[in-house]
């Protein structure tokens, strides 16, 4: 069988930013609420206005969710272009505080990678 070995963890460094956590930071209300927020606040026209060909484009934005849920260091990881990364960054920065990540039962500061898909319809 498999064994679980508990390794004692030293006190979590106050300013450490986790990349892997047991419980990911999430938008308040979960994925459904996040989808609703994006539909209301993301300008989906940015891609077509920017001249993107019809199709589906996914941009990935990385940011830090602090222990109090505030968002910082919002940066695009992709370079699809047509203004999509800038629009995704704007929408995330303007949103509410997130529910912070947890590690070993403690609220921690953690990175979050968030894909956002833009769809450009055929005219």
Task: Please give the residue ranges for each predicted region.
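Charge-biased low-complexity segments
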Residues: 1-123
């Amino acid at each position: 069988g498999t064994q679980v070995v508990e390794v004692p963890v030293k006190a979590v460094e106050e300013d450490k930013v986790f990349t892997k956590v047991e419980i990911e930071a999430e938008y308040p209300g979960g994925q459904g609420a996040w989808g609703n927020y994006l539909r209301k606040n993301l300008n989906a026209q940015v891609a077509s206005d920017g001249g993107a060909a019809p199709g589906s484009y996914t941009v990935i934005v990385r940011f830090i969710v602090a222990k109090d849920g505030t968002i910082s260091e919002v940066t695009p990881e992709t370079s699809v272009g047509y203004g999509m990364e800038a629009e995704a960054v704007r929408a995330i920065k303007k949103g509410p505080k997130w529910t912070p990540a947890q590690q070993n039962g403690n609220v921690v500061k953690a990175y979050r990678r968030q894909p956002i898909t833009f769809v450009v319809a055929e005219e």
